[in-house]
Regions:
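Flexible loop/hinge segments that line or gate small-molecule binding clefts
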Residues: 107-143, 254-262
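Short beta-strand segments enriched in small/hydrophobic residues
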Residues: 25-54, 134-135, 161-170
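Extracytoplasmic "Venus flytrap"
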Residues: 39-56, 61, 70-81, 103-105
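Hydrophobic alpha-helical segments within soluble ligand-binding/sensing domains
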Residues: 136-161, 253-257, 273-290
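Periplasmic-binding protein-like
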Residues: 91-102, 120-124, 162-166, 192-193, ...
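Hinge/cleft segment of the Venus flytrap/periplasmic-binding protein
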Residues: 276-323
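Venus flytrap/periplasmic-binding-protein-like
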Residues: 122, 225-226, 237-267, 304-309
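Hydrophobic membrane-insertion alpha-helices, especially the h-region
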Residues: 8-24
Length: 323
């Protein structure tokens, strides 16, 4: 090999090494740094007991979109003022988007208009889209109530009163569910009674009254997941109560409730895809923060589930989502 060939060969090697070093230090090919989207999820409960599947979907979207999601619970149950304070705090701390499960939909919308958050809000509930709310993700509560009413009218005795249990009619979606149930039960000749939670033992006292001779049996409907969960736990703990509460229906699904449905404590419930709800909320928050989103309203489809349907596995993917 001549000296000229050796020099050319060495120069080629040095050039390749130089190009490699330059590219690896981003001096030639600079990788575009992806900004992390900070998302605050503020829910309407003091814990995440009713958000298992929602969080699974949320976590999957967080990984896919490389977001930083902060899941925030309330310190006091159904405290709308505290929820407002948390929204303000998260905005001041630099959240790029907020996902809000409102305690009270009407108050939340008014407060958002007052606060003027300056970042997109994904609203978990059926609200009108305005300057504060970028997207709403909801399920038709009236339709769920109407479906439960139909199932009761099809299989239950109109001579047995129906008690509707609620954490509070002012809370998001409960009035719609109430109207839906009564739209069927009233024409069908059922006697309907509303029981709103006033204290920790409201539901238990109402059920205890059934064991007295002067009080008759009744059917129970939990109009929200909190009411349904508490009613199911009370009935599961007492065979005497189950003799007088002839059937339990409700809205909402958790792993515990599905197990109670399988054991016959709950006769039927309305469920929807909470995994998709969690995933979509983060996805839309990331898109809205980047100014890239199309859907303004997303409506999830509810399904009626009883023991037979549960065991058939038709809705297994929806009820028991896996990543």
């Amino acid at each position: 090999m001549s000296n000229r060939e050796k020099i050319s060969w060495c120069a080629g090697v040095l050039l390749l090494v130089a190009l490699y070093l330059l590219s690896s230090t981003d001096l030639i090919i600079k990788e575009k740094k992806r900004e992390i989207c900070r998302i605050s999820v503020i829910i309407d409960n003091v814990n995440d007991n009713y958000y298992g599947s929602f969080r699974a979907g949320m976590d999957m979207a967080e990984k896919k979109y490389q977001a930083d999601v902060n899941f925030i619970t309330l310190y006091a149950e159904n405290d709308e003022e505290q929820q407002e304070e948390l929204i303000v705090r998260e905005i001041k701390d630099g959240a790029n988007a907020i996902i809000l499960a409102p305690v009270r939909e009407d108050l939340a919308v008014m407060k958002l208009d007052e606060i003027s958050p300056g970042c997109p809000v994904i609203f978990l509930g059926p609200t009108a889209i305005n300057s504060s709310v970028a997207c709403s993700i909801s399920v038709d509560r009236y339709e769920m109530g109407r479906t439960i009413g139909e199932k009761i009218a099809e299989s239950e005795d109109p001579a047995v009163p129906v008690c509707l249990f609620s954490e509070g009619m002012a809370y998001t979606g409960n009035l719609d569910a109430y109207d839906g149930i009564r739209s069927v039960l009233d024409p069908a000749g059922f006697t309907v009674r509303l029981i709103e939670k006033k204290s920790e033992d409201t539901y238990r006292k109402a059920i205890e009254e059934t064991v007295y001779p002067e009080s008759g049996d009744f059917m129970a409907v939990g109009m929200d997941v909190g009411a349904l969960s508490e009613l199911a736990d009370i009935l599961e703990g007492s065979s005497v109560y189950r003799e007088h509460v002839t059937a339990l229906y409700g809205i909402g699904s958790t792993t515990v409730l599905l197990n109670q449905l399988d054991r016959g404590i709950v006769k039927g419930l309305m469920a929807w895809n909470r995994f998709d709800e969690g995933y979509l909320s983060v996805e839309k928050a990331v898109q809205a923060a980047g100014g890239e989103w199309k859907e303004k309203r997303i409506t999830l489809t509810p399904e009626y589930i009883d023991g037979e349907i549960l065991r058939s596995g038709i809705f297994e993917k929806m009820l028991y989502p896996m990543e």
